[in-house]
Amino acid sequence: MSLKEIAHRAGTSVSTVSRVLNQPDYKCKNPELEACIWAAAQEISYTPNTAAQTLKSGAPQIKTTPLTFDIFLTRFPSLSQDLFFSELFESLKKELLRQQCVPGKFLTLPEVTSMLKEKSSFSVTDTHADGIILLGKCPAELISTLQNHYHNIVGIDRNPTNFDYDEVICSGTTAAVTAMNYLISLGHKKIAYIGDCSYEARYIGYYQSLISHNLPLDYSNIYPTSQTREEGMKTMELILQREELPSAIFCANDSTALGVFDCLQRHRKKGYIPSVISIDNILESEQTKPMLTTIDIPKKEMAHHAVNLLLDRIHNQHSNAVRIELPCRLIVRESCSYCGR
């Protein structure tokens, strides 16, 4: 009945639904249809039929109650403000369902902060999940409360933490150094940075690269922002007002770079076309004009390892905090060129 209900909601066949949900290597030709199928599956709290799968494989049947994991977006009030976390969230939902788990509540920083102010509401939520997945850098003051409420925690981010819980990271510092080294190899010396500067690994990678190449750290080229598309556009407007313009711009994430492109398309100064590079490799980075050169952060793999760490801990396979670090990768497209100065 579950597959039929999902097929009805998504407007497709049961066989297509089954392939999307139960075959990890299946690639749906229609991305929008695939998104509808996963959304419908989450709406009805679908989990794969393990009994049917074990019967087919000949393995003994074991009745289990699906594990539920809440997901906490730690830095933004909405997924729309950072498309990296939006895509990571989609990968997580798929991975949870593939591992016969159920996505629980989706929490944001304003919601959790409000719960803490009400004191008792956080500890008496109507359902208690088996664990929680943190998306992004969690405020230090929330860690002890989360650890008291959730026995199993895993974090996913570009920055490592010193907190005592499992985490899957792709080093923001390494990603930033990779981006900066590429710009410098193209002859760029005046490189602006747009992004968070507060204990931020990508900012550390930015200035470390300048120092290692004996380039001056010009604070007038550093623009602290909250790393949204809107902030990227506003910051680029400020840059365009300068007399001396940077030849290249390093954005801490793709969302910021999209805002930079928005601004350049509206207010491009004659003859000024800066090289732009960023971090994340979101889907939209392939659709920009010019196509965005970026650093790939392996979102699907991060989601996969995060769920595995939670299940491993729940099954008492490890007790110490584990950190898995995945490599980043330079994706060269069209938005960077040799410096003409």
Regions found by a protein language model. Give the residues of each.
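N-terminal helix-turn-helix DNA-binding module of bacterial transcription factors
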Residues: 1-58
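A generic structural signal for short coil/turn motifs at secondary-structure boundaries
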Residues: 24-28, 78-82, 165
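Short amphipathic alpha-helical segment that frequently serves as the phosphate-/nucleotide-binding helix
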Residues: 31-34, 85-90
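Bacterial carbohydrate/catabolite-sensing allosteric modules
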Residues: 42-43, 48-50, 70, 74-75, ...
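Interdomain hinge and pocket-entrance segments immediately C-terminal to HTH DNA-binding domains
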Residues: 60-79
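Short, flexible/disordered intra-domain loops and linkers
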Residues: 77-84, 112-115
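A short, well-structured beta->alpha microelement
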Residues: 104-121
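Short beta->alpha connector loops
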Residues: 111-114, 134-140, 255-256
